[in-house]
């Protein structure tokens, strides 16, 4: 469940990055790479499948909603040409940007819906763990980068 929530967080961060154009390194500017990492590194489909088993009596419904988040992100990879330069933050057309931002929004919303099928106590526990990890990361960053702020903080920050 934590990894599913991390994808939701990554969707928000990527959306802000696209809209602001602020990124620290070249890799972060590649939208297709970021979306691919959300799907593969966080094993979104596998984790949605696994977490849906917690939706007592509504596992299939939960799975269908969660798969919708996967499909929204997959569209970003499938819809555009295979060129690694087709979706760069600094060169993206307004039409492509609108499509990608909508897909990221849909994925985040479907994850929200997916989470409503799961036990609230477990969702809250996973969110608390993420908040704790993010706080540790922020403190570590502040210690190592005196005076610098995060370019793309966690949602709500």
Where are these regions (language model features)?
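Alpha-helical segments in soluble extracytoplasmic regions
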Residues: 2-79
């Amino acid at each position: 469940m934590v990894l599913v929530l991390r994808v939701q967080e990554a969707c928000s961060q990527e959306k802000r990055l696209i809209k602001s154009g602020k990124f620290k390194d070249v890799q972060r500017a590649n939208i297709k790479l970021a979306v691919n990492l959300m799907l593969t590194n966080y094993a979104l489909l596998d984790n949605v499948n696994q977490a849906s088993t917690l939706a007592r009596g509504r596992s299939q419904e939960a799975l269908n909603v969660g798969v919708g988040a996967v499909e929204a992100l997959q569209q970003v990879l499938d819809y555009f040409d295979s060129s690694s330069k087709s979706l760069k933050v600094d060169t993206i057309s307004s039409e492509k940007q609108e499509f990608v931002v909508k897909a990221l929004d849909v994925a985040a919303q479907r994850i929200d819906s997916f989470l409503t099928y799961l036990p609230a106590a477990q969702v809250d526990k996973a969110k608390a763990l993420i908040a704790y990890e993010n706080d540790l990361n922020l403190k570590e960053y502040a210690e190592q980068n005196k005076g610098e702020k995060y370019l793309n903080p966690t949602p709500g920050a």
